[in-house]
Amino acid sequence: EKDLSDIIEKSYSVFRKKNVVELNRVGDRTVLELFHGPTLAFKDVAMQLLGSFYEYYLSNKNEKINIVVATSGDTGAAAIDAIKGKKNINIFVLHPHNRISTIQRKLMTTGNEKNVFNVAINGNFDDCQNLVKAMFADKSFSSSINMSGVNSINWARIIAQSVYYFYSFFLIKDRSQPINFSVPTGNFGDV
């Protein structure tokens, strides 16, 4: 229990606000702010926790993993920030060359950590994703490098992202009206 509390505290100490996520009123709507993490992406909420879980587990087992992730921006930046400098973990981030925003490119490529490897792919996000899927499908290869992922195929990430929906539900005082969550999304991983 103490270890879990320490992991959570460490994970969210990098956020700009004590409350990792906040509810604010905008007119007659309530908005859940998810941009207070180090990369300004909602994915920081799950990635920071996931990075700390990986580090804790791997240090206790004295094992190493190689995380491979495909991104068009936010996932890569959030994953790199969560994994950079952590022992026993390397992260390989595949993104489409010249098809991400300047800020996302800078967040992903200007670090100097020995465990972060950024790979620009000639193609689009689907090409990056297909490469990652092919690596996972090659069981001999993926097990030989102890490969793991942090894209939305990772259930620990999805669970960590789900928490803020429940958290916000319980913070909303007036439940006389139905509560609807509206999420701008490029794919299911945003939800």
Task: Enumerate the predicted regions with their spans.
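PLP-dependent amino-acid enzyme catalytic core
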Residues: 1-191
